[in-house]
A protein has these predicted regions:
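DNA replication initiation on ssDNA origins
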Residues: 1-69, 78-86
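Hydrophobic side chains in beta-strands
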Residues: 58-60, 74, 109
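Histidine-centered divalent-metal-coordination microenvironment in nucleic-acid enzymes
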Residues: 71, 95-121
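Active-site-adjacent loop/helix surface patches within enzyme catalytic domains
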Residues: 71-74, 79-99
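Helical (often loop-to-helix) elements that flank the catalytic cores of nucleotide-handling enzymes
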Residues: 82-90, 110-126
Length: 126
């Protein structure tokens, strides 16, 4: 758990949650997402990693407007995962692809040290 907490370090006074409500015809999971203004606890992390309860959405931007990671959320269906991953490899982009809970694709960009959230947003838009 500590490795995940370090990799996905973010705001510690609030987090996102999502309650699934089924699938659309195109395969995307539907549901409600919202912000919970409470401390992110080890119990929340462990429940999330165990696949229990509502999801835990770490807010990447910390209180000082820096972040150690960013994410591109691709929710265009159908998704050709192989084509996107091959493009990432071909272009040698520093992105880590992961299938999202909704059936989409998350492309993560990680940093060893916190950097300006504005810079991360600019780089992910390039």
């Amino acid at each position: 758990m500590e490795e995940f907490k370090n990799i996905f370090e973010g705001l510690d006074v609030a987090y996102g949650q999502h309650q699934s409500e089924g699938k659309r015809a195109d395969g995307k999971q539907e549901g409600k997402s919202y912000i919970v203004k409470k401390i992110v606890t080890d119990d929340l992390w462990q429940s999330h990693l165990d696949g229990e309860g509502p999801s835990l959405g770490i807010i990447p931007i910390m209180a000082d407007n820096t972040s150690k990671w960013g994410c591109i959320d691709i929710d265009t269906y159908p998704i050709d995962y192989r084509k996107i991953i091959n493009s990432i490899r071909k272009l040698k982009l520093p992105l880590v692809p992961c299938r999202s809970k909704s059936g989409g694709l998350h492309l993560f960009l990680f940093f060893k040290n916190p950097v300006s959230a504005k810079l991360i947003r600019e780089k992910l838009r390039e």
